[in-house]
């Protein structure tokens, strides 16, 4: 295709040109050109290779690729500019203008290319050496370290925290006030604010066991599971629609959400929780609870055949997405980086990626009916005539145009509305041997470029290298995967699990990259503590509630968020990784909405069941869906349920939730952002939800306090921020009320930092 890079131009490359090549040119060649123009390409197109200096100089079939110093005569530049018939990369979007400018500059500098000789394949992994990396080492249970200030220690983990602080000349902050502490622990464990009565009872209780009793009560609350589940649903990219252009609804996906809530409330051991999600159908095919757990596999975005007509390719995309999320959620590894080539940073060969994917090769979607065969037959008969008419209309609409097309589309909507509700199902999975995907290493991740065949096997860095592959026709491959993930010798699963719990309570994990424990991820701020907690999790039968309890009863957790030595500590530890004070945090989107509902008296605490579609701007819905795809409940009380029960659609997120950093649900979300920007203030001051609930709060305050403005202000502050108003706050509030603005006063409370933040 293209040819010739002048040897003289690259013989003595200047430093700037070489730097430009290495930083700007070579990465683009590797990402955009090597697929067709390198030694590893399935077929070298145009006879041109660009993966070495010598190969580039030799050129291809159509002449010189580069004329050093003259971009106008360089065919490579013409090709990436898409001039004439030469277009590179072929059948892909044109390179960005800035990238093309880099190539032009490189040619003007004489096209310096420091590569010498033939490209050499990377050396095989030295797994023995790779296992020396901290994350792949066995979990070590060390005794808690000795500390100077023994009086500060309430729990063993305090010794690890205090030892780190003392080693750096720091001290922990004083204890938090009881008012701050109850608000903190209530939001952390239930996602809801404490009532004024609960706050007063706790602050007036002088018993040394008062806080312990509070923690135990909250851990036993059914709202504990709702709060804990939200964090997990982020990790597993929970949504009830498939995204892309159709955003197809996955009926009854909410059963997975309820399964997770119940699992956390029941304190289901984490190894069992993991196993049921990976292989619940293999454990008990007809058990609704186990099948609900396997909805985990169905939660990812899916491009259906209309957007991807090649069924085998679509299947590959689904398996890829599931493999990636298993690696992120349970192993804390970016295994997806080994899909197209060996992982650049972690000891994960491409072959290992497809071996991991092979555990899923026989997994097929399967909707478990929750009605009898007789009931199903009646439903089918009721739907038969409507479905036949729909088939006729859909054939007709393909040929129609203009007004006729609109008329038929309306008829389709009318017929769809007549369909009886579908049978209750669980959108789970099962193994189908005859539909098992033959697994191969895919060269560059391309479905058509199949390399050597592979069968299921764990990641090599985490097992004995002599371990053979599992037979491809193993009847329960995912059970074997779950068994490996939860083996006592497997170091990542317990570390990743306890790190997520730590993050829930302190805002930042001991490893602050919870989905990446690899070389590109963060190193643990307190590795001994991480391992001690991981071993404690396994010793306690993988139960999570004892871990929560231990953290919450520690002095590390009960610190104030205002350290008197902050000015010194922040210079030594600017991110507060060693916990010299508690990290103040903004409430999540769900917590803000639920808190406004609770304070206003509108919160509906109904648990479980179908997800709720809350009112959203009709114009916004109309742009994305048919009216039937966003049907607001006729029961207005349903709109006031907790945020975890709102439907999670990929193509339309509730604007209030989006502005406060609710995740996009396209991939695993290991940690929420906590941004601060103008649209948040606009939402809280001018948004329909905040104003509606401010009105409800104003009415509640009048009902509870009557016309006594002093009492009303006191009650308002106790409800909203869990304390009485300061003198200045009281005076300002009374002035506001004298102006006859009770709703605006209530709205101002929602906008206080004391409402939006936990100390």
Predicted feature locations:
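Aromatic- and Gly/Pro-enriched helix-to-coil junctions and flexible linker segments
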Residues: 4-281, 343, 362-511, 519-555
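Alpha-helix C-terminal capping segments
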Residues: 393, 397, 733-738
